[in-house]
């Protein structure tokens, strides 16, 4: 296969991977963790994925510890856990 054909194939595979929605089975396991504000006392507006409602919800993060189900924006939460 020529290098142009390989580049086209790589481009198509990349496009397919970007456009394929995340199914429940492909969602990272940390998306199922509950919101955890952590032990510190900061007041940081964050978002977590709520697996029951299947929505990204706002919560206040204390600034340390917590868990991986913690995103700086609703969009980042959606991209990671909802595939949108």
Swiss-Prot record:
It is found in: Secreted. PANTHER family: KUNITZ-TYPE PROTEASE INHIBITOR-RELATED, SERINE PEPTIDASE INHIBITOR, KUNITZ TYPE, 3. Keywords: Disulfide bond, Protease inhibitor, Secreted, Serine protease inhibitor, Signal. SUPFAM superfamilies: BPTI-like. Belongs to the venom Kunitz-type family. PROSITE patterns: BPTI_KUNITZ_1, BPTI_KUNITZ_2. Disulfide bonds join 31-81, 40-64, 56-77. Its main location: secreted. GO terms for molecular function: serine-type endopeptidase inhibitor activity. Serine protease inhibitor. Residues 31-81 form the BPTI/Kunitz inhibitor domain. The keyword Flavoprotein does not apply. InterPro entries: Kunitz_BPTI (IPR002223), Kunitz_BPTI_sf (IPR036880), Prtase_inh_Kunz-CS (IPR020901), TFPI/VKTCI-like (IPR050098). Residues 1-24 form the signal peptide. It comes from the Eukaryota. GO terms for cellular component: extracellular space. This is Kunitz-type serine protease inhibitor 3. Expressed by the venom gland. It holds the Pfam family Kunitz_BPTI. The record marks 41-42 as: Reactive bond for chymotrypsin.
């Amino acid at each position: 296969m020529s290098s142009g054909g390989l580049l086209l194939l790589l481009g198509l595979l990349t496009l397919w991977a970007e456009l394929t929605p995340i199914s429940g089975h492909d969602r990272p396991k940390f998306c199922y963790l509950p919101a955890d504000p952590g032990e510190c006392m900061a007041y940081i507006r964050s978002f977590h994925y709520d697996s029951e409602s299947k929505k990204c919800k706002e919560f206040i993060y204390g600034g340390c510890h917590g868990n991986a189900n913690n995103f700086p924006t609703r969009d980042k939460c959606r991209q990671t856990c909802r595939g949108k």
